Amino acid sequence: MAVPTALTVQSTKGIRRVLPAFPTTVGEQLETLLGDIRPDAVKLGMLATDDVLLRIAHLLEGYDGPLVIDPVLRASDGSFLLERRAWPNLSERIIAGATLVTPNLAEAEALTGTRDPEEAARCMRDFGAKAVLITGGHASGDPDDFLLSDAGGQWLRGTRQATGPVHGTGCALSSAIAARLARGEDLLAAVERAKRFVERAIARAYAAGSGARLLRLEPVSD
């Protein structure tokens, strides 16, 4: 089940415009779904505006299942995908109740003020998140991720693949983790399996246009 928070005008070459959904519409859709079906996990990505964010935060206050947050802040060209004034509420109202937060290095720095992934993860735990996964796919070198939870911190190593820019890797990773948690898997297993799933999709990425390549997502059996 999905609740759209915005429409984007985009292609493989980037995002041209973001059209936020009406907060009342987002709230009504989410409230309608929650009144009918209890999701086994919830994943939040781009929220676009402070009003949409606050409406979602209010409606999820009573939700006690896994909550995965992909804190999408900016497009690759630097344009805002979550308005700047909403960033404090993202930390205080959304991240504070998260099972897992999955920022990339740039997002982690924007929200915490530090470029060090381990320190950024500790800061986001201080916001209230139960666990934090700082993803390294947008950094130079190998895409190593840092996971911090009640079990401690550990690095999850990755290998850079020579496919060039690939669209949607962070969204796919957070969604795959949420799907694993919905099945009842423990956090570390869910993260490791989701990471392998996305790495395979990156290895099979294909060019549909003249910009970033697209993930080729395939069914999994494990």
Which role does the model predict for each range below?
Residues 110, 163-187:
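Short, small-residue alpha-helix embedded
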Residues 84-153, 188:
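Conserved phosphate/ATP/ADP-binding segment of small-molecule kinases
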Residues 7-8, 48, 73-75, 107, ...:
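Glycine-rich beta-alpha junction loops
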